[in-house]
UniProtKB/Swiss-Prot annotation:
The gene is nanE. The lineage of its organism: Bacteria, Pseudomonadati, Pseudomonadota, Gammaproteobacteria, Enterobacterales. It comes from Escherichia coli O127:H6 (strain E2348/69 / EPEC). It catalyses: an N-acyl-D-glucosamine 6-phosphate = an N-acyl-D-mannosamine 6-phosphate. The keyword Hydrolase does not apply. Converts N-acetylmannosamine-6-phosphate (ManNAc-6-P) to N-acetylglucosamine-6-phosphate (GlcNAc-6-P). Belongs to the NanE family. One of its GO terms (molecular function) is N-acylglucosamine-6-phosphate 2-epimerase activity. This is Putative N-acetylmannosamine-6-phosphate 2-epimerase.
Length: 229
């Protein structure tokens, strides 16, 4: 049975939650062994897959979880706004570390390596390709190039202002066009994640609301301060 078929079964049985275990950079939690522990806890709680940034974190996580891992490498480049898995060597390193799915930036922005080249390299390793997109045009273009999974990850992050709510319209548009969509980006409540599934998402990735303790504390503190001022 193919990995996609296995995931289809798991999603049907468990609801399609993917947990992104990416601590705040330089956080006390930003250690491979802690990332792996969070991933294992997420798997035991019913996550159908895990999203991991960085080769060391992926290696540590691969050693303890059996669910599929979506691997990425983030870089801050001087000559490109693209941050997610921008180079062939990133794809190779993630494949060697044990990723099952490799996600890349799928936006139509200046980049060091074309999307189609990165997709070909992912498929060379026999892995599934996911593209993190920001618009319907991005997603449909990546689908035509052969990406098996389209993520709404970058919706709201390629424009001057980022909305507070997730982009359900993008989920529906891509799903209606026949894309296998992972809804991602600002899904901070179970209700929002369920709404994404109702809009046609194949699965939903949740990060900050589960694994970024600093963000969660800040949300509480912001609201609680308003209550006493």
């Amino acid at each position: 049975m193919s990995l996609l078929a296995q995931l289809d079964q798991k999603i049907a049985a468990n609801g399609g939650l993917i947990v992104s275990c990416q601590p705040v950079p330089d956080s006390p939690l930003d250690k491979p062994e802690i990332v792996a522990a969070m991933a294992l806890a997420a798997e035991q709680a019913g996550a159908v897959a895990i999203r991991i940034e960085g080769v060391a974190n992926l290696q540590a996580t691969r050693a303890v979880v059996s669910v599929p891992i979506i691997g990425i490498v983030k870089r801050d480049l001087e000559d490109s706004p693209v941050r997610i898995t921008a180079y062939i060597e990133d794809v190779d390193a993630l494949a060697q570390a044990g990723a099952d799915i490799i996600a890349i930036d799928g936006t139509d922005r200046p980049r060091p390596v074309p999307v189609e080249t990165l997709l070909a390299r992912i498929h060379h390793h026999g892995l599934l390709a996911m593209t993190d997109c920001s618009t319907p045009e991005d997603g449909l273009a990546c689908q035509k190039l052969g990406a098996e999974i389209i993520g709404t990850t970058l919706s709201g992050y390629t424009t001057p202002e980022t909305p507070e709510e997730p982009d359900l319209a993008l989920v529906k548009t891509l799903s209606d066009a026949g894309c296998r969509v992972i809804a991602e980006g600002r899904y901070n409540t179970p209700a929002q994640a369920a709404d994404a599934m109702r809009h046609g998402a194949w699965a939903v990735t949740v990060g900050s609301a589960i694994t970024r303790l600093e963000h969660i504390c800040q949300w509480y503190n912001t609201v609680m301060k308003k209550a006493v001022l």
